[in-house]
Regions:
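Alpha-helix N-cap and loop-to-helix initiation/capping positions
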Residues: 65, 92, 151-159
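Histidine/lysine/aspartate-rich catalytic loop segments that bind and position anionic ligands
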Residues: 140-145, 162-165
């Protein structure tokens, strides 16, 4: 209950973004010539010891934004010639992201990428259906022992093993 305090994701009741900008160094297939319109959300439900965005994932860095402001950020990134809107580690903000996407969609003409750690619940994925064009999960662990030791998440693979087929069901196999 985030009304009573921060959750496992290190976040409270507001959307917090660490950075929103063109990002030319994402996976080459989504960066293109101008870069991916990347929104790095603060916080994360995983506790990976090797996280490359540790400051973003463990601390409430960045700025709080409203749903309307988030939708405006998506459109501004599109105006800057982003090849897509790349939502990085947004699972814990999904209800608000969905609202922002619904606000922006009439004017948004570039694909939406859900860039996640693969640890997505069916409820989250069902909320995103029809709004996300590309799922970009990182499949991190196979064994409960490894996931528990390195992410404090022993059920990681059992959750991801259900999430990834659902992602494929929604958007189909990748086309390069």
């Amino acid at each position: 209950d985030r009304e009573k305090g921060v959750g496992l994701c290190h976040c409270g009741t507001e959307i917090r973004i660490a950075r929103a900008a063109l990002h030319p160094w994402e996976e080459p297939c989504i960066s293109g010539r101008h870069g991916s319109g990347t929104v790095f959300f603060s916080g994360c439900a995983l506790g990976c010891v090797f996280c490359q965005n540790r400051k973003i994932s463990r601390q409430a860095v960045g700025k709080a934004v409203t749903v309307t402001q988030l939708a405006e950020i998506f459109l501004k990134l599109q105006e800057q010639q982003a090849h897509n809107i790349n939502l990085v580690t947004g699972s814990h903000y999904t209800p608000w992201i969905v609202q922002a996407l619904e606000l922006a969609k009439p004017k948004l003409h570039i694909p939406v990428v859900w860039n996640c750690g693969g640890y997505e619940s069916p409820e989250i994925l069902h909320m995103l259906e029809g709004l996300v064009d590309i799922y970009l999960p990182d499949l991190k662990f196979y064994t409960p022992e490894t996931a528990g030791a390195y992410a404090n998440c022993p059920d990681y693979f059992s959750v991801a093993a259900k999430a990834i087929p659902e992602m494929f069901r929604q958007v189909g196999k990748p086309v390069w």
